[in-house]
Amino acid sequence: MQTNAQGIEHISLITTPVILLKGDKVISQGTGFFYVLEDSTKKNIIFLITNYHVLTGNAPKANKLPKGDNIKFYFHKDPNNPGEVNEIRIPIFTKENKEVWIVSKDYPEADVAAIPILSSFTKGASVYAITENWTKSNMKIRPTSAITLVGYPYGFFDKKNWLPIWKTGTIATEPLYNFEGKPLILIDISAFPGMSGSPAFAIANGAYQTIDGPTTVGQVRMFLGIYASMQMVTEAKYLEELVQKESKKGIKISSSLELGHIWKADLIVNMTKNIDVKKYEEEIVKKLF
């Protein structure tokens, strides 16, 4: 379940670079991953999950036009030969100028977006993904528990084998509570541009404490959410000048607290469950190309 025949972690095969373009010009690059909604009435829909700002170049609720008009991402052709991939390129608007992504109706400020993937895009590919079951584990997580992001910092990764980078930090807030009333966990980590959209996991290889208290032994991969951004603080720096009268001229400097924002997995589960598949097919899919 966790590795393929070549010993590659399942998680390494669910991620993809997500590149925003305007025409053929690259605007920016982030990370995305594949999530499957297991629902007999919805035919196990595959979603590309990433950040809103990765798809548009803007923050949620910024009321700005997207900086690009199409994206590209990748599927592995053969997990036993991960260097072979299929490139997929899609517009982010239909011919009638409707966006192809969905967002959370409950938290429109959440920097999360999902795109249902057409079945034609997965032909000739081996699609690896995570499901809601990955959010369910008896592993106890708490502040200081390890958390791992998987993605493409500054677009850096193993391009020969088309495999991502794993970066590990620790949980910095109480994970069972919503930080500032939003479905967020803060993490202590050194993360960089390009990691936006990375899936976040709590991982155990061996002994771990269960939520009931006892320690057990096993292998756990628990999906916690999606990395979005770092927490910044802004402070004023003044240059003292003596002219005819005292004055202050200054600049503002932004500093990172080395705290990252993780939008919780439940947010993704709920927003994908709430999609009206028939309406999406009629309004988006049939008018995409």
Segments (PLM) and residue ranges:
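C-terminal subregion of chymotrypsin/trypsin-like serine protease catalytic domains
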Residues: 8-11, 48, 202-289
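Serine endopeptidase catalytic core focused on the charge-relay Asp
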Residues: 10-16, 20, 28-29, 38, ...
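A conserved glycine-rich beta-strand in the N-terminal activation segment of trypsin-fold
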Residues: 25-46
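Short aromatic-glycine-enriched beta-strand elements
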Residues: 44-46, 185, 224
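N-terminal positively charged helical leader segments and presequences
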Residues: 55-58
